[in-house]
């Protein structure tokens, strides 16, 4: 489940209107994937806020498969997730996570919360029995991953760090041939020909949507599966 832009409005939250839909989605995923040995953990969703509906999803999944642990990025009280899930932590936050130190929310975190990642405060006692997973890190946009090795070093340094998931694997674009037979990979509003516009009015930000920006094109490989330059850095680190 991901509700991203409307999760602040309690969707799905604890609203009973959404309970049946999100539980059904969870059940269907478990039934589809529970016999695949590569699936080592169930995820209740991503960027969808918090609320009792996620506990209902977990209960439904456990009824079908009680052999796996659970992950949920939006679990603020860690009653649903078996891991501490974070997005895009800075170097100092990585050190606090590795040393199991309390984390408070800064002004920067509050701004980030309005855009995407849910930066959660963490009390020292919440680390007990909960390893740390970066559900998104190393945002692979343009000429990126310059400090990728620093994350790898921290994964190796701290025993409570499981690792993380690079955002993301492949450019999110659709293959279309133009009238001359040339290959094109389209995303955003390429199909409507709209001009890009500011996503949110925060000074010095580049959060944009539209046809001439590249927020969907941030994979370590292209939509045609050809490697981007930063995949060399990933290979070196891993």
Task: Label each residue range with its predicted role.
Residues 1-216:
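Substrate-binding/catalytic cleft of secreted carbohydrate-active enzymes
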